[in-house]
């Protein structure tokens, strides 16, 4: 006989799981802190500098970045047109789809451009009382309440043909009496 009482008294070594704040985020791995002289992280010291890369050069590139944006000021010299005149100028050489989308936004759809013709016709067909055509449902017979199979039978007038529908199995094709 095994003594269960002794097995319960023995304690296994408990594992302690640290809190989420004990985990170092991946983005911080290798970061030695913000140094003023832009030294690479300690894990980067093992790699050789290729192609004249140095942190000092990156600082110069950031300072000289203003020369890249000289040409971008030319687009600012062009005066901005109001929205209505921009639409007119775009439709002169624009596509017919833009014209159609602008027409849809007109007042013939109650001022709401999202309403389409189909949905406005369908909304008029819905009865005002909010009722929809609901199909009537048959009540389950007492035989079906407890999860049993449902069988129905009917006789065709003037003949002995009987149709049986069985929802649980097709092998039981006996006649109901």
From Swiss-Prot:
Residue spans of biased composition, Basic and acidic residues class: 72-89
Record region (Disordered): 72-177
Domain CRIB: 17-30
Biased composition, class Low complexity, residue ranges: 158-171
Signal peptide start-end: none
CDD domains the record matches: CRIB
Function of the molecule: Functions as a downstream effector of Rho-related GTP binding proteins of the 'Rho of Plants' (ROPs) family. Participates in the propagation of ROP GTPase signals in specific cellular responses.
Identification of the protein by name: CRIB domain-containing protein RIC8
Taxonomic source organism: Arabidopsis thaliana (Mouse-ear cress)
């Amino acid at each position: 006989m095994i003594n269960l009482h002794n097995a319960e008294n023995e304690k296994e070594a408990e594992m302690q799981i640290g809190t989420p704040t004990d985990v170092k985020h991946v983005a911080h791995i290798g970061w030695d802190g913000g140094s003023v002289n832009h030294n690479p992280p300690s894990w980067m010291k093992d790699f050789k500098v290729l192609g004249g890369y140095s942190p000092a050069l990156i600082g110069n590139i950031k300072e000289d970045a203003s020369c890249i944006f000289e040409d971008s000021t030319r687009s600012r010299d062009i005066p901005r047109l109001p929205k209505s005149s921009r639409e007119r100028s775009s439709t002169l050489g624009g596509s017919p789809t833009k014209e159609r989308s602008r027409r849809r936004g007109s007042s013939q759809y109650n001022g709401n451009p999202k309403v389409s013709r189909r949905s406005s016709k369908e909304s008029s067909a819905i009865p005002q009382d909010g009722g929809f055509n609901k199909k009537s449902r048959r009540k389950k017979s007492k035989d079906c309440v407890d999860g049993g199979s449902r069988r129905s039978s009917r006789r065709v007038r003037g003949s002995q043909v009987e149709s049986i529908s069985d929802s649980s199995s097709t092998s039981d094709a006996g006649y109901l009496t």
